[in-house]
Amino acid sequence: MTALTLTPGSATLEHLARIYFDESPVRLDPACRPAVEAAAARIRAAAAGDVPVYGVNTGFGKLASLKVAPQDTATLQRNLILSHCCGVGAPIPRRMARLMMVLKLLSLGRGASGVRWELITLLQEMLARDVTPVIPVQGSVGASGDLAPLAHMTAVIIGAGEAEYQGQRLPGAEALARAGLTPIALGPKEGLAFINGTQFSTAFALAGLFGAWRAATSSLVTAALSTDAIMGSTAPLQPEIHALRGHRGQIDAAARMRALLDGSEIRESHREGDTRVQDPYCIRCQPQVTGAAMDVLRQAAQTLEIEANAATDNPLVLAEADMIVSGGNFHAEPVGFAADLIALALSEIGAIAQRRVALMVDPTLSFDLPPFLTPKPGLNSGLMIAEVTTAALMSENKHLANPCVTDSTPTSANQEDHVSMAAHGAVRLGRMVENLHYILGVELLCAAQGIEFRAPLQTSTALQAAVARLRAEVPRLEEDRYMAPEIETAARLVGAGALLDVVGIDMGGLRP
């Protein structure tokens, strides 16, 4: 696979998605090297001087007023990394750790952190040779950066900590040695440059964003299937309605659903003479709800693309001013807000999908579909409890959607007295995406069953392809059977984007 050449400050969402999903190899554009080396020289000069510079010749956090002798700077940086390796919980997934490493490369490559090029080279080589630090999932409050997770990442660079190599979990030094790499002792400020930053939170937020967008676009397919299954009206999808409001997401969602339903015999069969005047909101207001969620995801995408390219270290080397200045770019508040927005979107997409499932299994609302979508109700319960499962998942996602960024607490002896909780906010997105996959998977099962009850009438060509994709792995439900594996299969199809692959319609992108 050809390596992606990333220019610090110019990495795109498309680059980051390739790194996350495909584990594309990466390298930094070597054109950034002069700026990196100039900043490192500026830090070395400061370390040799008498003027206190935070993290260069001082302690950290509440201990910033304590001066450190020049001969102790290497020990200072090593102690910083080891003392901050306080993460707990399960190791984060390998692909998440790799994305986190790439984000750190992008930040260091801006030439404002003061690290030597040798460290950037080692981090690149760890990625290339499949040395992945073992990073516990819990321990960051999102300011001063993702300290504990980034310390676990950096520990391997200095020959400490643990790493995975060729499927084995090994001491960091051994993993490097097996890969033909050598640890590097940290110089002035280099440990601080590695652990000050938002790369853990940003990696999880990006993964949540990518999963949420795929789920949101897949939900338009399941929504269109549900609409046809209950013989819903397409009148609320008319473009003039959405143009009068003007929101891009709503306009796009309506257009995609019109395209998905175009040519449906089921729709044409009740276009005239339908006694129902209006469908319930979960059918009629789908573009307004899902479209709004898609707009929110695009807003979060813009924030996270900026953050992925940011220098989030402290202090920063300001080259043009020839200054080293303490600031607060490590504070992950933008990431925290983005994660909360993604969580809200995930919750709402699942909430309206769950109502569509409830509509289809209820014979008083489904326009003549049998109870719980089984041919022999009473003897069989059909999809009764599958709908209950979606209610449980919807409720869990509503709870998880409560904002995290508002839950600040003072840390580090009140020196770090406002934090973002971005890490917690971003990590929960993975669980929410998984829950949404299950909700949409059950909707897919229900809607396909409902469509088949409308035979001999056919749905649209695009939606027939979606049903056929499901039926390639899950047969029609005729009698009650063990359902759990089939829900897993349907959720997997949603999560993998399989529905998007077969409908033949461009579902749009995240670009704002």
From Swiss-Prot:
- Return the PROSITE patterns for the record: PAL_HISTIDASE (PS00488)
Q: Could you tell me which pathway this protein works in? A: Amino-acid degradation; L-histidine degradation into L-glutamate; N-formimidoyl-L-glutamate from L-histidine: step 1/3
Residue(s) carrying 2,3-didehydroalanine (Ser): S144
Catalytic function, reaction form: L-histidine = trans-urocanate + NH4(+)
| Keyword Cytoplasm applies | yes
Biological-process GO terms, alphabetical: L-histidine catabolic process to glutamate and formamide; L-histidine catabolic process to glutamate and formate
Q: Cross-link position, 5-imidazolinone (Ala-Gly)?
A: A143-G145
Q: What is its EC number?
A: 4.3.1.3
Subcellular location(s) of the protein: Cytoplasm
**Domain of life per record:** Bacteria
Post-translational modifications reported in the UniProt record? Contains an active site 4-methylidene-imidazol-5-one (MIO), which is formed autocatalytically by cyclization and dehydration of residues Ala-Ser-Gly.
What GO annotations for molecular function exist for this entry? histidine ammonia-lyase activity
- Give the record's keywords alphabetically: Cytoplasm, Histidine metabolism, Lyase
Which top-level enzyme class is recorded in the Swiss-Prot or TrEMBL entry?
A: lyase
Q: Which family does it belong to?
A: Belongs to the PAL/histidase family.
Q: Which HAMAP family match?
A: His_ammonia_lyase
Tell me which PANTHER family the record gives: HISTIDINE AMMONIA-LYASE (PTHR10362)
Protein name as annotated = Histidine ammonia-lyase
What organism does this protein naturally occur in? Ruegeria pomeroyi (strain ATCC 700808 / DSM 15171 / DSS-3) (Silicibacter pomeroyi)
Supply the source organism's classification: Bacteria, Pseudomonadati, Pseudomonadota, Alphaproteobacteria, Rhodobacterales
